């Protein structure tokens, strides 16, 4: 089964308009998204080419014209998928840590959907155990370890600040 390499949150009351918005915005970059089946209301699971590069362009687009984004909220690339067990997520994160230099400031960012096994704080403690980098910075990190837990699966990414689109924050 194909796995998404881009997650986009949207207003669940306007899924059709959100899908049109995504398609329209990506069409401007000559990109055709493949929408995969998503069991979660308010979340599209999508496959596109080079999602991190696309998001960098969309961040610039949103800064210039935030009105293009009315129905979508967060656009997050996914590097790897694994099971949402602590052990599997730690193993996947450990594989990404080499992308964080010793001098880099970093943080972990977790979003949970249909997952009640652990509270977010407990997850943060357990998942950061495998990150042997000294410089944590929650406000201005160089690197973000993004964990999107969707039931029994977890999408995990190592992102630069401009590789994740947070539309509500950019509109402020």
Task: Locate each region found by the language model.
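SAM-dependent transferase fold signal centered on methyltransferase-like domains
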Residues: 1-172
């Amino acid at each position: 089964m194909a796995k998404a390499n881009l997650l986009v949150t949207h207003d669940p009351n306007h899924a059709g308009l959100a899908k049109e918005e995504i398609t329209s915005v990506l069409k401007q970059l000559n990109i055709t998204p493949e929408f995969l089946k998503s069991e979660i209301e308010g979340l599209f699971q999508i496959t596109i080419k080079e999602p991190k590069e696309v998001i960098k362009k969309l961040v610039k687009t949103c800064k210039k014209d935030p009105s293009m984004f009315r129905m979508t909220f967060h656009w997050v690339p996914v590097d790897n998928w694994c099971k949402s067990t602590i052990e599997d997520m730690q193993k996947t994160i450990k594989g990404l840590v080499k992308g964080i230099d010793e001098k880099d400031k970093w943080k972990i960012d977790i979003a949970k959907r249909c997952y009640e096994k652990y509270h977010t704080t407990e997850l943060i403690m357990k998942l950061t155990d495998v990150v042997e980098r000294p410089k944590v910075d929650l406000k201005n990190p160089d690197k973000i370890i993004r964990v999107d837990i969707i039931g029994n699966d977890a999408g995990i990414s190592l992102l630069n600040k401009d590789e994740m689109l947070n539309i509500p924050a950019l509109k402020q």
